[in-house]
Amino acid sequence: VIIGSFLNITATLNYLIDQNLPVVIHCAGWKEAPNIEDTLYAGALTHQLLGHEFLADNDAAKMALDLYLQNKNSLLKIALKSDHAERLKKFGITKDLNFCLQVDKYPHLNGRLMGSKIVKI
């Protein structure tokens, strides 16, 4: 299990291509429910993977892909409509969304799940 985001989407993509294994994208969500920003990322990664002979063969992947394709030019606008954005507004930190939606700010993978811990790669 690796941890990816918009911030390192190309590094994540390259790692998955190099592994040449089936991919399952699991979105963290919030309190056992999906959220917009994670689903946008899943759609963006799915979009990238489709260009490398991977398949989007279930409804969740197709819905994430559609959400991303419909909003790829206005990610922040749609993310600011999310429940998570409302939570961030209460703390005065909506700028975090803008940061997290930056594409390829970091050219490497940051973390991997090993057992029950996230470790640096």
Segments the model singles out, each with a brief description of its role:
Residues 1-49:
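Conserved mixed alpha/beta catalytic, RNA-binding, or beta-rich assembly cores of soluble enzyme
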Residues 36-43, 47-121:
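Long, charged alpha-helical interface segments
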